[in-house]
Amino acid sequence: VLGTLENLCELDDKAKEILSGLKKPVSVCFDVKHGPSATIKFTKSGCRMEDGVRDCDIYIPLSSCEKFNGVIDGTVTPVPLKGLTKIGFLLKTFTALTDRLSEVMQPSEEALKDRAFFELSTKLTFYTISVALSQIGNQDKIGQASASYMLDGDIAFCIKDGPAATIRVKDHHLVTIKEYPKKP
């Protein structure tokens, strides 16, 4: 879900407004034991997530995928091992962005009546699903079994006249690229 922050910051005026107050770039790394890790770099103009532990301002290790899911659900409070001086970013900017992401990803029926909001919610849900497909193929035992049968190449995953993504398969490892493939 956190990878969808990229798209939120790109597509949503409220998220852009939240980031506009950022004085300098801040990067946050989530490192899940026996699970995925990613580093998200935030700037005034948006954010970018990269797989893996990268150079970061804030480092948050998590002991399991369940703990990470708890962080996402708000039932687990993460404890940074690095970046305590940047706690203000986590408590204000990061929390405001994730709250906005939750608002868009778990919309009320009333909010969905607004066509622009409906389209934003649909796009963000699509991008969340596209990234989840790769994560499942790489991290889940059944997903890994399925990926073991996949040939190298690009898979087009899209909504007609809407958002598109490429699921790139290389040596049974899946990567999501948030654009339509050149040669599906």
Feature roles, as predicted:
Residues 1-39, 80, 84-164:
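Acidic, aliphatic-rich amphipathic alpha-helical segments
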Residues 27-29, 52-55, 60, 66-79, ...:
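Long, compositionally biased, glycine/small-hydrophobic-enriched stretches that function as flexible linkers
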Residues 37-73, 158, 162-184:
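Low-complexity, glycine/alanine/valine/leucine- and proline-rich hydrophobic stretches
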